[in-house]
Structure formats: structure tokens, C-alpha cells
């Protein structure tokens, strides 16, 4: 009898190897899905945590000392630190009236 003919050519181990590969592929796909879900979950948590952190930081900054606010304002705007003090707020009313007077003078000059 020829060894290549009949049922003797198929062994159980060959089929078992294919089944093992199939199971390993399924386990790999399941693991990839789990890792993807975990990564998405972490990203969602970070997206929620960053605004919460920013809000608490801004609340703490707003309740902090005015010197710290002045330093930050001078750094952001490029204004010298001495010009960011409370005298600036006190002069706001004067500057506002000066601007209003200037506008009124322009209107008077335009009509005369």
C-alpha cells in the first residue's frame, strides 16, 4: 500500500496546529480590542480631568495675592511690572473721561 494514499496521510497533530493558531489569533484580537478600549477610556478621563485642573488652577490664581497677578499680567502683556499696579485702576476713570472729552471735542470741531 502506498503511504501517500488513504487515511494514513492525515495526522491529528496537523489539524491541532491549525486550531491552536486560530485560538491564538482570536486571543490576540480580543487583547487588541481590550487595549483599544482601555486607551479610549484613559483619553476620555484625561479630557475630563484637564479642564477640571485648569478651572481649579484659575480659581486658585484668582484668589491669590495681587502681586502674583500683577507679575503674571506684566509677563503676559509685556508691560513693566510697575505699570500694572492699583494706580492703573484708579486712573481708569480719568482716562475714560479724557477719552470722552476728546471725542466731544472732535465732534464740536467737526460741526464748526
UniProtKB/Swiss-Prot annotation:
Q: Per the record, which residues fall in region Disordered?
A: 77-112
Q: What does this protein do?
A: May transport viral genome to neighboring plant cells directly through plasmosdesmata, without any budding. The movement protein allows efficient cell to cell propagation, by bypassing the host cell wall barrier.
Keyword Lipid biosynthesis listed? The answer is no
Which organism encodes this protein?
Answer: Subterranean clover stunt virus (strain F)
Q: Where in the cell is it found?
A: Host cell membrane
The protein depicted here goes by the name Putative movement protein
What are its GO cellular component terms? host cell plasma membrane; membrane
Family the UniProt entry places it in: Belongs to the nanovirus movement protein family.
Query: Which portions of the chain have biased composition (kind: Basic and acidic residues)?
Result: 84-98
Bilayer-crossing residues are 27-47
User: According to the UniProt record, which cysteines are disulfide-bonded?
Assistant: none
Annotated membrane topology is: Single-pass membrane protein
The residue ranges flagged as biased composition, category Polar residues, are: 101-112
Q: Which UniProt keywords apply?
A: Host cell membrane, Host membrane, Membrane, Transmembrane, Transmembrane helix, Transport, Viral movement protein
The protein's predominant localisation is host cell
Q: Which GO terms describe its biological process?
A: transport of virus in host, cell to cell
